[in-house]
Amino acid sequence: MIMEELQGSDTPRAGLEMSKRDILRHTKRAWAPLDGHLLPDSEEENPMVTMYVQENSKQESIQQWLDSGFFVSVNENFQQTINHTASLHEQGIIQMTVKDYMRSLHQFSETPTLSRGTSFNSCYSTTGVPQSIPEWLEFWEKDPVEILLDLGFGADEPDICTQIPARFLGYSSAARGINIHVFLEAQKQRMDFENPDLYGRFQQLEILDHVTNAFSSLLDGVKTQQNQHEEKAERQAMQNPSSSGAKEHKRKMSQLLKRASRQTSRMDGNPALSKSCKTEHEIPTLPTKPWDPRVELQVASISHDASQMLPLIECGSAQVHNDLSPCPPLCPPPHALLDKPWPCSCTLAKQSPHTCLSEGSVRRRNWKEKWNHMDRLKNLSHIVSKGPDSFEMEEVQSFEEDTGNPLILTSGIVGTRVDRTNSCQSDSSGFLEELPELQPLQVSSMTGSQSPTVCRGCKPRDQSHSPASQQDSLQESYGSKSKSMTSSSLLSQDWSTLEENASASVVEEELQLKAMEEPPEIVNPDMTLIKTIMVGEHPESVAGPVVTSTSTCNNTMGVLVTHVTEKEDRSVGHKGTRKMLIQRHHFESPRSFRIDQPSDNFYHVDSEITKTEDNCKVCPDTKQSSLVQERPAQHSHQHRGAMPYKGDLVQTSEKSIPHLDKPPGHVPTDSNAASSWSVTTQMSSNLVSAAQRVADLGTYNKGTAFECTPCDPLNTTDLKLQTETRQVKDVAVQTYAHECKLRPSHNDFIHGPRPLAKSISLDTGFPSISATGFCHTIPAHCCVCCHHCPNCQWRRQSPGPEPSICRHSLYSQAEDPKVQFMKTLKILQDTTVRDLCSCTVYEMETMKMVCQSFREHLEEIEQHFMGQQALYPRDMSEEEREEAEYLRTLREALRQQVAELAFQLGDRARQIKEGILLQLDLLCEELPEHCDNLPQCNWTEGKHGQRSCVQTHAVAPDPTLPASSGQWTPCSGMTQPVALSPSHLETRGGISLQSPARAESGPGPSLSHVGEKSLLDQSGFDDLCTKCNVQEQL
């Protein structure tokens, strides 16, 4: 049908032109609503225009879809396409089929992807119509710039604040703790801080690079500076050879004159010395640098110039022995040395045929020369072997120092120097090839008659240590500003003295042989040992001790060499110092020493005890340290740590506690053996348990016992104290870990039992509830054992399941606080019952009333606490709830113990009553004349009369009534049996005893039962009074 319509069109060309005009017209109308030119009023006035514009836009969109290539690919005839679209539009079929597409087109029109001037209108502004498919594709191609802009390319990324709606930024947040502005500022700072630049994150590499460069430049600068100084001196010598040569010649002549003058005077008095000194010229000394031009002169001087150097060497060796003698008149110097010109090193470099000597050849030559003259070194007992090699980067000494070895003249001191010949440096870089093994210096033994050594830069040593100081004065100083001198105290002595000390020479020869077996070293004949080291250098890399001379005046050196390893850790391991120490040990105290550090960097070691070590090493009084790590094995039962409190109460010594190591039972009871403790009775709650432990040490000491009664843990409402009691072993020093129990001392048994010292109160601690008969005195002492306790012995012999007062069982570490409270209150109960022996019936009645009132007060407190806890159950933390539970346990235990105490008071009153009645019955059965001696008592008088009667009969000694003896203490819940006949039991059947089990299980019934029974049955007393009156009438 479509094909027929296309074929039926007569005027194709006219239709094409009309279609083109319609497309342009429709395009203008389609862009009009998108640009917003049409107002709502115009749309309401012209509804037909609006409908027409919508239809045209639909048609235009369909036309674009058709022109995109779908229909053109089927039929390339443009006229057919136009006719086909016109027929479809006329039939009105498009409106129902492309509804969804139009909706998407409307959404597309809201986002202007195409501009009217560039994309859409420009397509229709062309003069001609595309005739091919590539032209159509180019004609309908969208602008790539527009597409990229729509996708987000090419535009600046919007700030994060633009993505937040303005209503959130304009008003503050209603939520608490949130501030939008602060949040945004923090985010901005975070973005600024987190710089993606990796260079900022790895600035440490740059710092390390700077540090490395600084060290490298420092090392290079030191080497370069030394080289520059040397080159400068050489240039000056070359430029002005006459002046420099004259100065050097003058200086050498002055030195040689001094040496020659001393040589003549000393060799005249000691001919053997000159013979021994003649062998020293054969020991050469080579510079450090083997390629130095002066090497050839040094090697050649061994064979050719030995005779010329002999006076100089002899003069240097003679200085060692007779440097303290007065200087004699000058003698003519040897002309061979004075007239001999000393060429410069630069001249030698030109004249020497062996300038380019290899390093290996020089070393082999040095070793060969040294091994050839080793036998001569054995005969020189005064030569000091070389110390540690120098680790600094220094050039070799000048020519005259290498050959002549000038002496460093100091009053009484001969300096020693070590040349760089045997240095372990292979080049001038300053780094070692291998670390040389350190060798102890050897010093010949001196006689005790010589004066003490005065070291350079050191104070004179004590006169008492002068013999040892002569050998130990050789010390090394590290870190000095200039070249540090290692001074030797080899004083002048005769050759005969050296021969007498043959044993010392043998030991030294052996040590020298051992030293020679190590890496070879060449020793200068003039014994000058100049030790150079950089300032601040810390020679920690040197293995072994530095120097240790352990010898006294009667022993040769090397005897105490074994102590070197014992002391090397102490000599080196001193914090805060960058220097190694040289120690001196003596036989009298090899473990105790003191180190003094004077300002001149020399370290003196004296055999005294330092303040920091005398407490942990040696105790002169007790011969035993008071610290834990120094105690013997028998103190292993003590605690590993001691935490002092209140003025170091637990830090004691063996002398202050004489019975510390004695077993329990052997502790002296003498009051003079009390320890010098300062006891304070007002202790905090966390120290009460610790005081109980410490009180074990003061057992049986009169007047020094702590007031640590078993009721002390109850002086606070904080029940965490009971958990601290289980940890008391870590805070107190004690002899045995027994729990602190209450028991009477010997004085208590002699003078009778004492009343209760303190009463218990939950809220006030220890209130002074003073009732009739109460006496606040010193409580019974705390004890560890009861070997001498007659009360405990009587208890162990008596039958019954009652618990003992003096217990030895240890509280378990995991013991429940409730059980611990029960045990403590049980001890309180036993103590109270024991102290009731001296109480009267009226006092016991008063105490019973106090117990009842206290029980009522405790119930009121409990109700108050429960009400407070019910009001704030949610606000309580876990710790507060736990504390409340502990308080409840405490109140329950107190209530139970108060009920038990009330029962015991009533029981004791009944016992007193039965005892009185028994005494009355026995007196009534005796003869009437005995009854006449009875005092006249009015039994119906009341309480005061009862009290006087009871007191009268309580003092009468009787074996059946041990309550008056003061030696018997009833057990908790234990009823004392009395001898009563069946008739008496029948007449007094109203009196019944209640067991403590019933009292503990039910405190309420026990109190009610006690309340029902009075302390003294008035009817029973009336019967007794009637009997007495009848007997008196008879």
UniProtKB/Swiss-Prot annotation:
Bias type Low complexity, positions: 477-486
Region annotation (Disordered) ranges: 223-290, 442-486, 624-678
Segments of skewed composition (Polar residues): 443-453, 465-476, 669-678
Annotated InterPro entries: ITPR-bd, SSFA2_C, TESPA1-like
The UniProt record lists the keyword Coiled coil: yes
Gene Ontology MF terms: signaling receptor binding
Keywords: Coiled coil
Coiled-coil stretches: 843-902
Entry-linked PANTHER family: PROTEIN ITPRID1 (PTHR17469:SF14), SPERM SPECIFIC ANTIGEN 2-RELATED (PTHR17469)
Name of protein: Protein ITPRID1
Organism name: Mus musculus
